[in-house]
Amino acid sequence: MLVLPAIDLLDNEAVRLLQGDYSKKTVYSSSPEKMIQVFEEQGATLIHIVDLNAAKTGKSENEKTIKKIKEKCTVDLELGGGIRTIDNMKFYDGLGVSRLILGTVAVEEPNVVEKAVSLFGQDRIVIGVDAKNGYVRTKGWESNSGILYKDFLTTMYGMGIRHVIFTDIARDGMMEGPNTLAYAELLETFPDLQLVASGGVSSKEDLVELYDKTNGKLFGAITGKAIYEGKLDLKESIRILNQKREK
């Protein structure tokens, strides 16, 4: 189980939003590439990046920053937010992004997902499922799709998708712990899903609980605010999970 440090980009700064509310942002750094270098030094092997400008409007304001990050870091990157066309995907593929996260487009144009898997391969396409009160949210969490997340996942799974990031919006940025039950249930329903947990991870104890409650089957867990505010030691958390995996 990997620990994925998260960086959310808004106007070329690293920020965090409270429950996806763009009016409730905290700016953590105006040099996101320096933060990623620190994460890399602490042992992270995969970094989770969200382009919040693109997630909301479909237009990125952060392409130069993403390019700079990739130039300065050797760690793998996964990127989400506003990736809604094959041309978008080709652009980020050209920058060297390892995993492309599709959210809104997967809900509104599932045929694009099929094309993406065909072009880039099953292991490089990740579906971002952002859920609140059981329903999938789109367009930077601002729109309710009216689709139950379990139905949506069943559809994606049937199309060959095996990599999923599931975000519990109600937990995001609240530092209240993750929804471990939801992840355990999803892995029971879809046993070979490479599932990443997102939302609420605020301590190494949360990571251990996720590992234990899913019998080590979780692919990874994303955490951002807890790292920035000193509540989660990234290096120590990675060490603990590595130890558990080796037992």
From Swiss-Prot:
| Record-level GO cellular component terms | cytoplasm
Organism, by scientific name, is: Leptospira biflexa serovar Patoc (strain Patoc 1 / ATCC 23582 / Paris)
Indicate the principal place this protein occupies in or around the cell: cytoplasm
HAMAP family in alphabetical order: HisA
- Keyword Amino-acid biosynthesis present in the record's keywords: the answer is yes
CDD domains attached to this UniProt entry = HisA
Q: Which Pfam families does the entry mention? A: His_biosynth (PF00977)
Q: Which UniProt keywords apply?
A: Amino-acid biosynthesis, Cytoplasm, Histidine biosynthesis, Isomerase
Q: Which molecular function GO terms apply here?
A: 1-(5-phosphoribosyl)-5-[(5-phosphoribosylamino)methylideneamino]imidazole-4-carboxamide isomerase activity
UniProt name for this protein: 1-(5-phosphoribosyl)-5-[(5-phosphoribosylamino)methylideneamino] imidazole-4-carboxamide isomerase
Q: Please indicate which superkingdom the organism of origin belongs to.
A: Bacteria
